[in-house]
């Protein structure tokens, strides 16, 4: 703030620094959305009924979602869940998570498409020193959700390009799903500032599990749709 006070308010540097500070203040450090449930058995029954409304059949999928909810409810202070929904196009993978899991758990839903992504910077931002730089999609999800434990849905994991730039994206996803490191995630725009992603619920969707990096796949609870 002292640097800001010393700058000319009409200068580009003033606007750039003020935007940076405002963005930091918008990150919901330490703010979590919690499930306030008094009767868990009743809550599960209601959750199953709500899932039946948005998912026709697919009892195995609904069972997995209820299992995730049970694990989460048993210890809301533990690390988030990492799982993947896979199957052919058009079977409702996004609907299952957006209208099913997220609503049942009362958590903000965030959608990130990996298909066609050029490099990892769209996820972890660009350095503040670059003109026009900004933070990445992951921090954007936290800011929009106003909490550190939203659902973040990565679509088309198997469509990441098989190039060095694609490998950058995969390596970043490996990093944010590593529970020994993801409490200290750093967006390049906010270099030096640790951001806790350990409470996020990461969901990956894909058609072909054979195209997924083995290290990343080992961390994902797979749900066939």
What residue spans do the PLM features occupy?
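Conserved catalytic/switch belt of AAA+ P-loop NTPases
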Residues: 156-195
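A short helix-turn-beta junction within AAA+ P-loop NTPase domains corresponding to the substrate/partner-engaging
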Residues: 107, 213-225
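Walker A/P-loop
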Residues: 78-114, 143-144, 174, 214
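A short beta-strand-to-loop transition that corresponds to the Sensor-1 phosphate-sensing loop
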Residues: 155-157, 178, 199-209
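Pre-Walker A (pre-P-loop) alpha-helix and adjacent loop at the N terminus of AAA/AAA+ ATPase modules
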Residues: 1-33, 39-86, 138-139
């Amino acid at each position: 703030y002292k640097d800001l006070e010393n700058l000319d308010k009409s200068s580009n540097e003033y606007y750039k620094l003020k935007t940076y500070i405002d963005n930091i203040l918008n990150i919901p450090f330490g703010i979590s959305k919690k499930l306030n449930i008094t009767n868990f058995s009743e809550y599960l029954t209601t959750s199953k009924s709500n899932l039946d409304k948005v998912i026709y059949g697919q009892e195995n999928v609904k069972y997995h979602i209820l299992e995730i909810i049970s694990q989460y409810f048993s210890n809301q202070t533990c690390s988030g869940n990492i799982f993947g929904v896979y199957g052919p196009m058009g079977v409702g993978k996004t609907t299952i998570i957006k209208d099913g899991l997220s609503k049942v758990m009362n958590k903000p839903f965030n959608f990130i498409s990996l298909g066609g992504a050029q490099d990892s910077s769209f996820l972890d931002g660009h350095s503040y020193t670059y003109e026009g730089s900004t933070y990445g999609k992951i921090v954007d999800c936290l800011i929009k959700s106003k909490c550190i434990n939203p659902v973040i849905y990565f679509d088309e994991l198997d469509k990441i390009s098989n190039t060095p730039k694609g490998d950058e994206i995969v390596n970043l996803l490996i990093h944010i799903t590593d529970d020994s490191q993801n409490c200290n995630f750093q967006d390049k725009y906010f270099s030096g500032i640790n951001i806790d992603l350990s409470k996020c619920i990461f969901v990956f969707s894909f058609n072909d599990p054979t195209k997924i990096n083995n290290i990343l796949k080992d961390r994902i609870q797979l749900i066939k749709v």
